Curated annotation (Swiss-Prot):
Gene3D superfamilies in alphabetical order: 3.30.70.860, YajQ-like, domain 2
One Gene Ontology term, aspect cellular component: cytosol
InterPro entries per UniProt: DUF520 (IPR007551), UPF0234-like_C (IPR035571), UPF0234_N (IPR035570), YajQ-like_sf (IPR036183)
Function recorded in the entry: Nucleotide-binding protein.
Family statement: Belongs to the YajQ family.
Pfam name, any one: DUF520
Record key words, sorted: Nucleotide-binding
Keyword field contains Nucleotide-binding: yes
GO MF term set: nucleotide binding
Organism: Methylibium petroleiphilum (strain ATCC BAA-1232 / LMG 22953 / PM1)
Name this polypeptide is given: Nucleotide-binding protein Mpe_A3039
Length: 162
């Protein structure tokens, strides 16, 4: 039976490259001279440091631009963390790199496929959703449906089997 997996996986090598490029640009930009603005990557956490909220937003813009240039969707970053004050006027923000579909989104995909009355089944498997069907055309229609209705996360499809 043909099947595919719906996953949420960023290219971590490109994320690291974007962070490195952002660090270089921050180091050479005139408006950041003498400031403690920087970007660090540890595991799947990107930490932004700056002297003020305004500079932090500039650092975030630089990082987003570099991610976009490296073909990494900025929606992979979970920027819901609040800005923390660290000594004096300095601030930091920790961004998590999303990897794996959370259970809420997986259930949404599963219910979407069931409600569409297509001849495919969706099964949640850890941090991925496997969609199986009798025909390849049904699977392609399911992919189009998922892309159209689940736009808040950058989903990708892999492991397509015939």
């Amino acid at each position: 039976m043909p099947s595919f997996d719906t996953v949420l996986e960023p290219n971590l090598v490109e994320v690291r490259n974007a962070v490195d490029q952002s660090s270089k640009e921050i180091g050479t930009r005139f408006d950041f001279k003498g400031s403690s603005a920087r970007v660090e990557l540890k595991d799947k956490d990107i930490t932004l440091y700056a002297d003020s909220d305004f500079q932090l937003s500039q650092v975030m813009d630089i990082l987003t631009l570099k991610l976009t240039k490296r073909s990494v969707d900025a929606r992979f970053l979970d920027s819901s963390a609040k800005i923390e004050k660290i000594g004096g006027d300095k601030v930091k923000q920790v961004l998590k790199v999303k990897e794996g579909i959370d259970s809420e989104t997986a259930k949404k995909i599963q219910q979407l496929i069931k409600a569409s009355k297509m001849k495919v089944q969706a099964a949640i498997q850890g941090d991925a959703v496997r969609v199986t069907g009798a025909k390849r055309d049904d699977l392609q229609a399911a992919m189009a449906l998922i892309r159209k209705d689940v736009a808040d996360v950058p989903l990708s499809f892999n492991n397509f089997r015939d």
